[in-house]
Structures are given as C-alpha cells and as structure tokens.
Amino acid sequence: SGIAAGAGQAQTLLWQAQVEDLLAQDTLLQTEVFGPLSLLVEVDDEAQLKAVVKALQGQLTATLHAEADDGPLAASLLPLLCEKAGRVLFNGYPTGVEVCDAMVHGGPWPATTDARGTSVGSRAIERFLRPVCLQNAPAALLPPALQDANPLNLLRLVNGQWTREAISSPH
C-alpha cells in the first residue's frame, strides 16, 4: 500500500512480511531502504520479537516506539538494538541528522564498512584516515608530527604518557 506522492515527494510505502521469512534471512527483507517505507512484521511474543531483532543485519538507525509501561521490554530490547544500529531512537524518526560532536551516522555492516566511524559530525573526517606505522624509520624521513623534537608542539602519547615534550634520544 502507499500514498501517492506529490510533486517532488517520495511515495510512502507500508509493507507487511511474515516473521518466518525475516527469520530465514530473506534478502529482500534484509536490504536497507532509504525513504518513507515501513515494514510491518507481526510477532507472537517477546521471544519471537527478540529473534527478529537478532536476525536483522546492521542498520544506520533503529527506532523503538514504546510507552512508559513498556519499560522492561524496552530495556531488554535496547542491547539487541545497539548491536544492530549506529543510532537508536526512542519514539522519534531518523529524518534529521544533526551535525554535532555526538552524532553517529554509521552502524554495523552492511550499513557501513567500518562501524567505528560516522559520516556526519566532527568525527566524520576519521573515515578518510588510517593508521600507518613507520617502524625504525630514519629521523630525517619522519613527518614533523612524528619527529622526536615535536616541532608542531602536538599532544602525543609517548610510552603511555600524554606529553608535548620532545623525546630525548636514548643514545
């Protein structure tokens, strides 16, 4: 079913699936969809609901719609949802992504290829970084950030201690 879209709008869709198909890892049901779509899966009990959540692949977001008296069920679902999504919303919709330090717009695979990062916010630059070790590199070849003299006055972790001091040569 769906509501016809107006000019410049996406059509809203509501799909229904059998719980058995979702638990059997049906690829169509496991494909992340962007846009106004909801998938309705009716479960028999709390155990089946938890099995459905466990069967989900990684997602950017997961939303839990609950009322105050749903507290125990919500508390038991939260750890499962945290394993499946980079951002868990409560009684809300993931349509607005604020660009801020705390925002996480990522999640476990296949939502992202690296769940440690985010594509939004101040930490998004980390997606383009990767660690490289320069083991036993000659001092003349080291970039300024790695030189013993610390010419950039960077805060660095040296032998387990944070410091801006130059590293004295052991020779």
Description of each model-found segment:
Residues 1-60:
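NAD(P)-dependent aldehyde/semialdehyde dehydrogenase
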